[in-house]
Amino acid sequence: MATPHINAEMGDFADVVLMPGDPLRAKFIAETFLQDVREVNNVRGMLGFTGTYKGRKISVMGHGMGIPSCSIYAKELITDFGVKKIIRVGSCGAVRTDVKLRDVVIGMGACTDSKVNRMRFKDHDYAAIADFEMTRNAVDAAKAKGVNVRVGNLFSADLFYTPDPQMFDVMEKYGILGVEMEAAGIYGVAAEFGAKALTICTVSDHIRTGEQTTAAERQTTFNDMIEIALESVLLGDNA
């Protein structure tokens, strides 16, 4: 049954959904990597598609920018459409000098300055972590492709334009691999509603050096990340 934000029916979505932030990136992923694709959502332009990858039914849908937006879509996919696993595939900014542009980062955990997980966890700190099996499958898929990945903590920021740039020094000290805006929220939603989640990011810009990819590159050139996500789903089926 359709929700206020997703005009689909039960069965339209696969049990696994890849979620980029940009709905146009969702369209690109569906058209480039999936077969027998059909559109299953277009409310507010947040495009969603279902198709098959090597015969396996998989969906892909955008989630927008920030924890509030991605949390709405993740929650509805899980509770209203039977989704069991969500893989966020997005971009992040690097703060460490040893993390380079276009590196692939797997978010084993996600720190945040958002208070959403404290709200759901009775004002206590909640350790927002990815599902272990999904993480291991992504690492194994990357190894099989010969892609070096970094595994560790992300930082999910509420503000894109931070008023406190000194916080980047703290992140670097604590070994944060990338800064993005959604992982901690998606991990919290998955935990609350009994699903599993993982975030895989490609470094789109470097906060220290000023290096960055273009919007067009972010939409079309992060193929390694997408292939790792898709292959990890197949590994999960065979486990």
Swiss-Prot record:
The keyword Glycosyltransferase applies. Its EC number is 2.4.2.1. One of its GO terms (cellular component) is cytosol. GO terms for molecular function: purine-nucleoside phosphorylase activity. Phosphate binds at G21, R25, R44, R88, V89, G90, S91. The active site is at D205 (proton donor). One of its GO terms (biological process) is purine nucleoside catabolic process. The record marks R218 as: Important for catalytic activity. It comes from the Bacteria. A purine D-ribonucleoside binds at H5, E180, M181, E182, S204, D205. Belongs to the PNP/UDP phosphorylase family. This is Purine nucleoside phosphorylase DeoD-type. It comes from Yersinia pseudotuberculosis serotype O:3 (strain YPIII). The gene is deoD.
